């Protein structure tokens, strides 16, 4: 009996070696089907899934590290991962990523480093952004650069260069990329990338104005609030694409001129000298300032007489600059900055209507024909207006063009009177000659009438 037992135990040790037993014990539980996995009761705490997730027991045990697993083919599996194919966790296809795909535009969530992930099926080259400030130090991520490149692909080269120049300027004045966009409802705080994304680059462009001022550190009474003040966001306006490209070309020309001057170009130095002389000449011209809050009565009477004395007085100049500003301290401020506490925008609308009325009244005064002034304007009603007014050259001291026209009319009247006198004398002479000479045709008529009467009488007598 003992011999028989030994013979039975001997072959069994071949099939159950220590290695196979170790593998069998350490092998995790794998259900045969999803339905079987759901119906099977949960047991053995190390194989139970996490609470609130739909991960399989195997994913629970080995973790949910997407970067470790790599792709769905299972080529980059861990040391303890023996199963391949469908059992390997897929990239961007687990529970944590699926919950964020709808809110993130279909791109992977932040746990896969989505800030630097490029959009799918994207064949764009962003290497030409390498020298731009906004492409460095994480100001614009790679994904943002891909989106920006896709937007700029449909525009012209000059438009692309202008927008890149504005974005480089924005790096220094808006570190977090947030700006105040001027809309019909007032200022709207938004990211600059959304502003560019919503532009029609065939018609629309942008302009950036920095609002670096220290007025917020003081109250209306003049008391100091303190050093901790919120930094002001730059103001962005939607403008025609032609104006944006023109402003960029002018700025580029200035930079090129400075570069030529630094290289010692004589031609550039002469042009700079001419510009400085014209600027000094313009600064020596007389100027007068009106505020937007002026009353219509003062504007039409007192201020208008002051303007006429500047141009037509004994010591008047040939040119005067008229400034329409908010006040002396806030001459360059926008109406949106002055009434920034107006949430509904009602004060801004009323102020803009009043400024339009002041502008219309001033231009009606300048277009007076009796004065004969010529003028040009720069700026807008949102910030300030500058009128350059010149008077026409006149002859004979301070006579205006109206007096010259009056003398021409008087001269024409005297010439006409002389012509009428000559014609009247000629007509009177011809009438006197006609009265002095006899009229033979009248006598012949009388003779004919007498002969006819005699013939008529003789005819009656014969009867």
UniProtKB/Swiss-Prot annotation:
Coarse class of the protein's main subcellular location: mitochondrion
UniProt keyword RNA-binding, yes or no: no
Annotated transit peptide: 1-69
Disulphide connectivity of cysteines: none
Pfam hit, one: mIF3
Region (Disordered): 25-124, 208-229, 391-449
GO cellular component term, pick one: mitochondrion
Annotated signal peptide: none
Amino acid composition bias (Polar residues), ranges on this chain: 48-79, 391-405
Protein name (database record): Altered inheritance of mitochondria protein 23, mitochondrial
Source organism of the structure: Lodderomyces elongisporus (strain ATCC 11503 / CBS 2605 / JCM 1781 / NBRC 1676 / NRRL YB-4239)
Lineage of the organism: Eukaryota, Fungi, Dikarya, Ascomycota, Saccharomycotina
